[in-house]
Amino acid sequence: MEESPPKQKSNTKVAQHEGQQDLNTTRHMNVELKHRPKLERHLKLGMIPVVYMKQREEILYPAQSLKEENLIQNFTSLPLLQKLCPKDPENMVRKSWASCIPEEGGHMINIQDLFGPNIGTQKEPQLVIIEGAAGIGKSTLARLVKRAWKEGQLYRDHFQHVFFFSCRELAQCKKLSLAELIAQGQEVPTAPINQILSHPEKLLFILDGIDEPAWVLADQNPELCLHWSQRQPVHTLLGSLLGKSILPEAFFLLTTRTTALQKFIPSLPMPCQVEVLGFSGIEWENYFYKYFANQRHAITAFMMVESNPVLLTLCEVPWVCWLVCTCLKKQMKQGRVLSLKSQTTTALCLKYLSLTIPDKHRRTQVKALCSLAAEGIWKRRTLFSESDLCKQGLDEDAVATFLKTGVLQKQASSLSYSFAHLCLQEFFAAISCILEDSEERHGNMEMDRIVETLVERYGRQNLFEAPTVRFLFGLLGKEGVKGMEKLFSCSLPGKTKLKLLWHILGKSQPHQPPCLGLLHCLYENQDMELLTHVMHDLQGTIVPGPNDIAHTVLQTNVKQLVVQTDMELMVATFCIQFYCHVRTLQLNMEKQQGYALTSPRMVLYRWTPITNASWEILFYNLKFTRNLEGLDLSGNSLRYSVVQSLCNTLRYPGCQLKTLWLVKCGLTSRYCSLLASVLSAHSSLTELYLQLNDLGDDGVRMLCEGLRNPVCNLSILWLDLSSLSAQVITELRTLEEKNPKLYIRSIWMPHMMVPTENMDEEAILTTFKQQRQESGDKPMEILGTEEDFWGPTGPVATELVDRVRNLYRVQLPMAGSYHCPSTGLHFVVTRAVTIEIEFCAWSQFLDKTPLQQSHMVVGPLFDIKAEQGAVTAVYLPHFVSLKDTEASTFDFKVTHFQEHGSRNAR
């Protein structure tokens, strides 16, 4: 802690050993970039070699060297999601899919807004919890807050004193007084303790890694007011501070993994939750320039990673980005050709081991290191003494090697050792589980012990969220086993690894919807057989039976999943392809409704911006679609480059997508050349939906060129014809005549309506009218219109009688079944008949019945008039998506109001 010092510039220092690089990404890059465009051109022309001789380079900077003039600039683009506190803390961690539309998760904020008014309450929070996945950058953010305050750029008016504590170091202390705690949070004593405590509302305590120690932060005695000099157990002192027994006016900033939130939220008063989402956009590239002091090396490394969408997505996690840079730098120093084909974090860690640890240490010393890591994970320890290292059999030579390579690091404030990152410790712990289990003398008992230890450490509900478990899945995959056998010169029996995986799967919480954590584990494993088997077994918890699918009004065939990051998007789309009961994938920004209303599908929601990188990884995974047949991107505004990438995917031989929805995506005539290239290729696409886009005559003519190609497989094309010229419509009609398999439609697609209890009784009618008006009311004469009824003789035009009354008339020419896709109405008639259809307001009738007290309006009201006896059946449309999956068709009533005022409800 320091008190309002003047701004001062800091110096850049080089780490003592080549691998001891701070994972913090906060130092200003003191590098001139004026030659970068030239270097990029040289790289593209092959003028700069990719094979490197060993060179001495400056190592990645410690956090202390951050230059203040660029500090806030680092914060500006850091993706932070401020969240609403969940009503049910039990379910706050699990990101599982469900049958209802998920509630909005919050909104994006800047670092300056951490202590601003909270969502909903509009009150400034005293407690802010920074949460996020392992290695996502929470500690870095916490250090940056302290540093920015010190440099006078952040919260200077808000706080007079800021204290930073590493909880892993605090855990080494048994007892502390408040005065001693504050002294530990100061780099240099700046004021007497009485003066500091005189204004508690000006104090900020930053507790980094509050979840790491095995603490129970309970306020032991809320009524007890201790003197600042009285010593007590550290966890009791922190519990009293957080419980507001001590310094109730003080402010707190906590960092924790998302999976640990459950044990904090119920006991903490009104916390503001902020999730760190990792690197975004330009930050990936910036990190490479911060890591590599040599500009040429930075450009070469980044361009190699940028060409691999999977590797680039993995770099969204700062810790993984460090891992990638470290591997590439090792290859440069060893004079190797740059090559990094890893598809998972586990594979990257194995690559890191092979490049970092000398062969002579792998068999014995690395095993000892793994045992040390595992013991620490089970006992919630991240700091180790020299005696701990000796106890595991680590000799001085090995420890020196691990320090030099950066696997271990020595704490400057003590004689303790730690792994370079907690994730790295968890990786070594996972290796320890497998190496121990591979010993024949242990057998099933050892396997049971390992799984029970994992459950005890992480809990059943969060088992798949634990990095150690994810690493286990990765190491037990085919590539993981191959890598371990090569590294440790051992053989891992196939039966053993399969048994361990199924033990873990069997110990997870039963009858729970599948969560993103499980998908992460399956992604790390990459075993096609396991993926197919597990995703098939999820049928009972995900997919309803055939009867439910038939009742599309209930939307039980739709599963919703929120993906906030590109990493989550990559994992979800990769795994969903192996789920044979989902045929369509839909990506929605916020709560924009899609248009694929019938096929069983998975809807991915995203409250955070969808970037070019997001689209790239989505389309990359769809190159091999397996079970997926449809893709619905309706409602998302698509840039030209995005559609270009999509079309490249559709032309890929492994892509088997048959149906594509691009309704209301902001497409213009410029995009049609891209779509035409897909139609001209031998693609699997058979249905294309392009309504509510401004394609124009020129755009549709380009589509016609693609449709004329003999290899075009398209059979259904949906367009808006009302804005097209008669000449273009004639071209479309000619195409249909020449190709009997081609069916061109111009229909209005109704949105689903989500009823709420406070919905006005005429709201649905208003919405229904507005949606119809978007398509235009003027009937078309060619190819059918939004208002046509389709029957035995083809389309039958609908006549607008009275626009004010919303009264329409249709003359059905003969007996048969007639269906209007626009409204959803369906008539069965015995003879030629004229039918009048009027859209009415529910208030005209509901006010006279008790129904308005017990039921909600969930669909439109029609006044249908026809000659008696001519109409034998009327099928009404449904426009409802239920929030509660427990509802059934018995909860619905179709009400008929007869001429004399009576009603019939069933």
UniProtKB/Swiss-Prot annotation:
InterPro entries cross-referenced by the UniProt entry: FIIND_dom, LRR_dom_sf, NACHT_NTPase, NLRP_HD2, NLRP_innate_immun_reg, NOD1/2_WH, P-loop_NTPase
Region of interest (Disordered), residue spans: 1-22
Family annotation (Pfam families): FIIND, NACHT, NLRC4_HD2, NOD2_WH
One Gene Ontology cellular component: cytosol
Keywords annotated in UniProt: ATP-binding, Cytoplasm, Leucine-rich repeat, Nucleotide-binding, Repeat
Localization per record: Cytoplasm; Cytoplasm, Cytosol
Tissues showing expression: Expressed in macrophages.
Main subcellular location: cytoplasm
LRR repeats: 627-647, 684-704
Family, similarity comment: Belongs to the NLRP family.
Other comment: Three tandem Nrlp1 paralogs, Nrlp1a, Nrlp1b and Nrlp1c, have been identified. Nlrp1c is predicted to be a pseudogene.
Domain free text: Contrary to Nlrp1b alleles 1, 2, 3 and 5, allele 4 is missing a CARD domain, which has been shown in other alleles to be involved in the interaction with CASP1 and CASP4/CASP11. It is thus unclear if this allele is able to promote inflammasome assembly.
Protein function: Probable inactive allele of Nlrp1b, which lacks a CARD domain, suggesting that it is not able to form an inflammasome. Contrary to Nlrp1b allele 1, allele 4 is not activated by B.anthracis lethal toxin and no other activation signal is reported.
Protein name per its UniProtKB record: NACHT, LRR and PYD domains-containing protein 1b allele 4
Gene: Nlrp1b
